[in-house]
Amino acid sequence: MKITQIHTNKPQSLSFEIFPPKKEEDFKNIDEMLEILCDCHPEYISVTFGAGGSSNNNKTIEIAKKIKNQYNVEPVVHLTCLCYNKAEIDEFTRQLSYEGIENILALRGDRNPNVPAKEDFLHASDLIKYIKDTTGDQFCIAGACYPDIHPEAADKVDDIKNLKKKVDAGAELLLSQLFFDNNTFFNFAEDCRLAGINVPVIPGIMPCINAAQIQRMVTMCGAKFPEKFQKIVHRYGDNKAALFDAGM
């Protein structure tokens, strides 16, 4: 089922995002993690995808297959484009189609210093349009959005303008990057509506339970980290159990 239909049927839906393990020996633990997540009855689970040359990309599709076939939950496959050409993207979409996977989160992807960017896709909107043009309505294509503004955007207006390009290219809904202030998201969603972005905007939430992980994600995506959460991390950062209780 396409996730647009899921959100139509059940507007308040739970989903998770997971990262394929980098080490082969950790891959055997994926079932244990999926069983825990699926006990929460998510409507879908998204699986991240590496930049060009990442060995995790085959694992992404393998995990997505497992989510769909073994756990009967809809997978959403992240697909990056900066380090891939059209032929490579065609191969990925063929694999997804063969496995019956209907949902893609189309992303530019982070720059990889070890793999040069290619010329076919410079922006996520380029990838969205290409998938839409080459596959029609076969996939539900989602785009990413940043309530705290994309770190490379000149300002909020520039960010919303680029986001509108994704929707005009064919994105059917938007999945947000993490944020820690609900008002930031509400204001962002209203800005989207005022700009004529009328697709669903789905909030992305990251529990404050791992100090190092939070710092890494905040630095990577430019999210604002409110003082009240900084105090939680400062007070409980050295005690995993206490930070988990306080952060949740």
Segments predicted by a language model, with ranges:
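Glycine-rich, positively charged N-terminal anion/phosphate-binding segment
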Residues: 3-4, 27-35, 40, 52-73
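Glycine-rich, proline-tolerant flexible connector loops at the mouths of alpha/beta enzymes
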Residues: 21, 42-63, 109-119, 172-188
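Glycine-rich anion/phosphate-binding loops
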Residues: 81-95, 121-123
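Active-site-proximal loop/turn and secondary-structure-junction residues that shape catalytic pockets
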Residues: 18-22, 49-53, 75, 81-83, ...
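N-terminal amphipathic alpha-helix/helix-capping segment at the start of soluble metabolic enzymes
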Residues: 1-16, 23, 132
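Hydrophobic faces of well-ordered beta-strands that scaffold small-molecule active sites
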Residues: 12-20, 43-47, 75-79, 104-106, ...
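Active-site mouth loops of central-metabolism enzymes
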Residues: 13-29, 75-87, 142-158, 234-248
